[in-house]
Curated annotation (Swiss-Prot):
Subcellular location: Cell membrane; Cell junction, Tight junction
Transmembrane stretches, start-end: 207-227
Modified sites of kind Phosphoserine: 308, 314, 332, 375, 379, 407, 410, 436, 471, 473, 575, 587, 590
Organism, scientific name: Rattus norvegicus (Rat)
UniProt keywords, alphabetically: Cell junction, Cell membrane, Chylomicron, Disulfide bond, Immunoglobulin domain, Isopeptide bond, LDL, Membrane, Phosphoprotein, Receptor, Signal, Tight junction, Transmembrane, Transmembrane helix, Ubl conjugation, VLDL
Name this protein carries in UniProt: Lipolysis-stimulated lipoprotein receptor
Phylogenetic lineage: Eukaryota, Metazoa, Chordata, Craniata, Vertebrata
Free-text function comment from the UniProt entry: Probable role in the clearance of triglyceride-rich lipoprotein from blood. Binds chylomicrons, LDL and VLDL in presence of free fatty acids and allows their subsequent uptake in the cells. Maintains epithelial barrier function by recruiting MARVELD2/tricellulin to tricellular tight junctions.
Signal peptide range in chain numbering: 1-35
Assembly information from the UniProt record: Homotrimer or homotetramer constituted of isoform 1 and/or isoform 2 and isoform 3. Assembles into cell-cell contacts. Interacts (via the cytoplasmic domain) with MARVELD2 (via C-terminal cytoplasmic domain); the interaction is required to recruit MARVELD2 to tricellular contacts. Interacts with OCLN.
Domain Ig-like V-type: 89-181
InterPro entries given in the database record: Ig-like_dom_sf, Ig-like_domain-LISCH7, Ig-like_fold, Ig_sub, LISCH7
Length: 593
């Protein structure tokens, strides 16, 4: 307009009609250097699901395309919470907003408010092809695409609000350069209840859901309880087998049966004679009749006492066979005066009563477990067997071959008897047996009555006088180095021949195979001379007697017949008690209640 006005003013002398025409032409056809801008948003309302992408479109129009504008997206929070108002439509605020919207059709109470009462942030800015995110949205996948479209690749909580699109240009003199779009981000809800990831269940009634939960909880506690009782049976009292540990754990049935029998008096298979009354049907049968038997191998009754260790008999009282009624009267004793109605004292009262009426002379059932249990209960007053030295039992006495012809009180007659009348077998089988350990020690002492006739001559293999070890058995009094003292061959038919000729003869006292040179020696020397042995024993020092003859004993073990079977440590306590019952008295080895 200024150039046209100047042109019109520059021709004052021209025709007035021409000037007016030129001015109108310039005003109409000359371009205006300043133009207006227009910004629009095609979809002002968006609702999306959380973590879903969304794009807010924005377009603008400018008459001057030579200048590149600056696009700015701003975030402003809602003036009012749309979600809260949606759940409470009958509130007072909603009614007031409805009245304002009715009076002013263009009024929006969720958008139109001052910026001072809500949050305002810059989301992104675009100038040319460069996009810059605001400080709050750094790291988010947000960009401006197209002319001015704002794109969210993944929405998040807090993105709900009003987004304003503003276009700024240096030649923008008039027009609307700003528009807004609302965005609401909601959480995702499945159409059907999802119990597990990828597993959906249909609609379920509330009461049915409660029943299912209760049953599942009951089964869980039952399984845990059973497994706990089986793995730790001492902490609870359940007796149901559990499949989780069938090999490691089992129910304490024996303890349960014993406790039930002790409280109710019913006979139990675990302890029938201790904790329960003996019913007539369960009374054990009487012991079998004892057949009187003579002394073994023809020895008198006092031979075992003479041949015991030390030559002395153990004068201890043995068990007396008394009547059970008398024993029950004598064993009344002290008794706990407990209240039988009290369940906690019934077991103790019943056990005290049974122990008071218990008679050791009454034979019990042949049950190894019961016998071992009885020994544990009745041996409380004895000394600890571990502190006592172990003592081997006395061996069975063996009959001497010359017992009928010689008395034990006259050993000299054996020496004076001619050798032709002595039994065959040499010096070892023809001598009398020792009656005690003291007699064995006298063999080694020179000048004793036993040394001249019971000691074999020294062996030529050893360079010293032979001193036999301290014998633990009457069968070990042979000299393994003397060829005349060796037993016969171990041929089993030889023993049968000996028994057929003389039933009383002891096969262990017979001589083994004889050397032909010994026969000639006996023909030249018909009688044994003990003076040579006495002279050899006088030269032996006292220290030689205490030497350990372990090697000689090992050699002797392979030359003699097998010894009797040793005492078994697995014998029960009741077996030892029955062996100690003798002469109608209670032995000190027996168990005392």
């Amino acid at each position: 307009m200024a150039p046209a006005a100047g042109a019109c003013a520059g021709a004052p002398d021209s025709h007035p009609a021409t000037v007016v025409f030129v001015c109108l032409f310039l005003i109409i056809f000359c371009p205006d250097p300043a133009s207006a801008i227009q910004v629009t948003v095609s979809d002002p309302y968006h609702v999306v699901i959380l973590f879903q992408p969304v794009t807010l479109p924005c377009t603008y129009q400018m008459s001057n395309t030579l200048t590149v504008p600056i696009v700015i997206w701003k975030y402003k929070s809602f003036c009012r919470d749309r979600i809260a108002d949606a759940f409470s439509p009958a509130s007072v605020d909603n009614q007031l907003n409805a009245q304002l919207a009715a009076g002013n059709p263009g009024y929006n109470p969720y958008v139109e408010c001052q910026d001072s009462v809500r949050t305002v942030r810059v989301v992104a800015t675009k100038q040319g092809n460069a996009v810059t995110l605001g400080d709050y949205y750094q790291g988010r996948r947000i960009t401006i695409t197209g002319n001015a479209d704002l794109t969210f690749e993944q929405t998040a909580w807090g993105d709900s609000g009003v987004y304003y699109c503003s276009v700024v240009s240096a030649q923008d003199l008039d027009g609307n350069n700003e528009a807004y779009a609302e965005l609401i981000v909601l959480g995702r809800t499945s159409e059907a209840p999802e119990l597990l990831p990828g597993f959906r269940a249909g609609p379920l009634e509330d009461w049915l859901f409660v029943v299912v939960v209760c049953l599942a909880s009951l089964l869980l506690f039952l399984l845990l309880g059973i497994c706990w009782c089986q793995c730790c049976p001492h902490t609870c009292c359940c007796y149901v087998r559990c499949p989780c540990c069938p090999d490691k754990c089992c129910c304490p049935e024996a303890l349960y049966a014993a406790g039930k029998a002790a409280t109710s008096g019913v006979p139990s298979i675990y302890a029938p004679s201790i904790y329960t009354h003996l019913s007539p049907a369960k009374t054990p049968p009487p012991p079998p009749a004892m057949i009187p038997m003579g002394p073994p191998y023809g020895y008198p009754g006092d031979f075992d006492r003479h041949s015991s260790v030390g030559g002395h008999s153990s004068q201890v009282p043995l068990l007396r066979d008394v009547d059970g009624s008398v024993s029950s009267e004598v064993r009344s004793g002290y008794r706990i005066q407990a209240n039988q109605q009290d369940d906690s004292m019934r077991v103790l009262y019943y056990m005290e009563k049974e122990l008071a009426n218990f008679d050791p002379s009454r034979p019990g059932p042949p049950n190894g477990r019961v016998e071992r249990a009885m020994s544990e209960v009745t041996s409380l007053h004895e000394d600890d067997w571990r502190s006592r030295p172990s003592r081997a039992p006395a061996l069975t006495p063996i009959r001497d071959e010359e017992w009928n012809r010689h008395s034990p009180q006259s050993p000299r007659t054996w020496e004076q008897e001619p050798l032709q009348e002595q039994p065959r077998g040499g010096w070892g089988s023809g001598r009398p047996r020792a009656r005690s350990v003291d007699a064995l020690d006298d063999i080694n002492r020179p000048g004793s009555t036993e040394s001249g006739r019971s000691s074999p001559p020294s062996s030529g293999r050893r360079g010293r006088a032979y001193a036999p070890p301290r014998s633990r058995s009457r069968d070990d009094l042979y000299d393994p180095d003397d060829p005349r003292d060796l037993p016969h061959s171990r041929d089993p038919h030889y023993y049968d021949d000996i028994r057929s000729r003389d039933p009383r003869a002891d096969p262990r006292s017979r001589q083994r195979s004889r050397d032909p040179r010994d026969a000639g020696f006996r023909s030249r020397d018909p009688q044994y001379d003990g003076r040579l042995l006495e002279e050899a024993l006088k030269k032996k020092g006292s220290g030689e007697r205490r030497r350990v003859y372990r090697e000689e004993e090992e050699e002797e073990e392979g030359q003699y017949p097998p010894a009797p079977p040793p005492y078994s440590e697995t014998d029960s306590q009741a077996s030892r008690e029955r062996r100690l019952k003798k002469n109608l008295a209670l032995s000190r080895e027996s168990l005392v209640v």
